[in-house]
Structures are given as C-alpha cells and as structure tokens.
Amino acid sequence: MLSVSRVASRMTGVVARFSTGGHGDGAGRGGGSGGSIRDAGGAFGKMEAAREDEYFYKKQKAQLEELRKHIQQEVDHHKSQLENHQKVLDRHQKRISEIEAEERALGKE
C-alpha cells in the first residue's frame, strides 16, 4: 500500500516531467503525444499547436455567444411575462376598487 507522501512525491515528478517544453515541442515535452506532426516537434508542431489553440478559442467564443443569446431570450421572455402579470394585477386591483365602491354605495342606502 502506498502512503500519501509517496503518492504525492510520485505525482510531483510526473508534473515536473511533463511541464517542461511548450505546445508543439514534440512527444513527451509539453503534454505528450498529439499526433504525428506534433510528435515531430519543430515549426510544424508549433504551428499545429497554434491552430489547435485557435480552434478551441473560436469554439469557446461561439459557445459563449450562444449562451449570451439564450440568456437574452430568457430575459426578454421574463420581461414579457412581467408586463402581462402587471396588466392582470392592474385589472384585478381595478375590479377590487369597483367592488369596494359598490359596497360603499350599498351601505349608504
């Protein structure tokens, strides 16, 4: 059975080993295998890593835009519901006022 300190020391070595190098520097440096072009390293590996980063940047940007649109639709929907509820509330308050006026008129007779 491994102790916590042994596991931690082993994990530290793994993190230190993989954190050397940058994206596209080749296999084993910067996160391991990413395909044959990235395994080779050099300019092509770095270019492929840059394209990959750009792809995920654009994908995240599109997802955030979709989320923003969806939330805006919800805001618009709730504003519409709020307006409808306000109209119903006003109508009910008017009806209550009319009933109270009728009660007062009946009380005077």
Swiss-Prot record:
Residues 45-109 form a coiled coil. This is ATPase inhibitor mai-2, mitochondrial. Belongs to the ATPase inhibitor family. It is found in: Mitochondrion. Residues 21-35 have a biased composition (Gly residues). Pfam families: IATP. The gene is mai-2. It comes from Caenorhabditis briggsae. The keyword Membrane does not apply. Thought to be a regulatory component of the ATP-synthesizing complex in the mitochondria. One of its GO terms (cellular component) is mitochondrion. SUPFAM superfamilies: F1 ATPase inhibitor, IF1, C-terminal domain. The lineage of its organism: Eukaryota, Metazoa, Ecdysozoa, Nematoda, Chromadorea. Gene3D superfamilies: Single helix bin. Keywords: Coiled coil, Mitochondrion, Transit peptide. Residues 17-39, 73-95 are annotated as: Disordered. One of its GO terms (molecular function) is ATPase inhibitor activity. InterPro entries: ATPase_inhibitor_mt (IPR007648). It comes from the Eukaryota.
